[in-house]
Amino acid sequence: MSKYTQEQIKNLVEGNLDWNTVLKMLSMPKDHERFQMYLKVLQDKVDFDDKIVLPLGPHLFVVQDPQKKWVVKCSCGHAFCAPEENWKLHANIYVRDTAEKMEEVYPKLLASDTNWQVYREYICPDCGILLDVEAPTPWYPVIHDFEPDIETFYKDWLGIQPPERH
């Protein structure tokens, strides 16, 4: 089992490691402290004090607020909803549903036919960062990516108690 320092984990998160080191870190069995070090690196990158419980994306986290409630929160501090809800329904949504809008991101002949596929861009209402993009058919409902079982992840995978929740 490989052991890594807090600095190495920080460099991994920031993309400052060479590919061979990254490959080794990803493929080798993880040391027991790795997830806690990872959370510390993420916590140091945000300006809010709420404890990060689980990252959902580069700028999206499940956090424990001061009342011990778990909330989905953007890296800027904007709170969306409980982790059981679909946070996307609380985001600003920009839909690329015309040829003109698609051609802003793809050349004309490479863009999707918007009768068959649209892009939905989910944006934080406070800071404007792009949090996710979907490419469904136009009539398809907003996709709820997943609902993490945080308690099981902590207890069965990490072997530790999850943060308190009310």
Indicate residue ranges for each PLM-predicted region:
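N-terminal pre-domain and mature-chain start segments
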Residues: M1-Y119, I129-H166
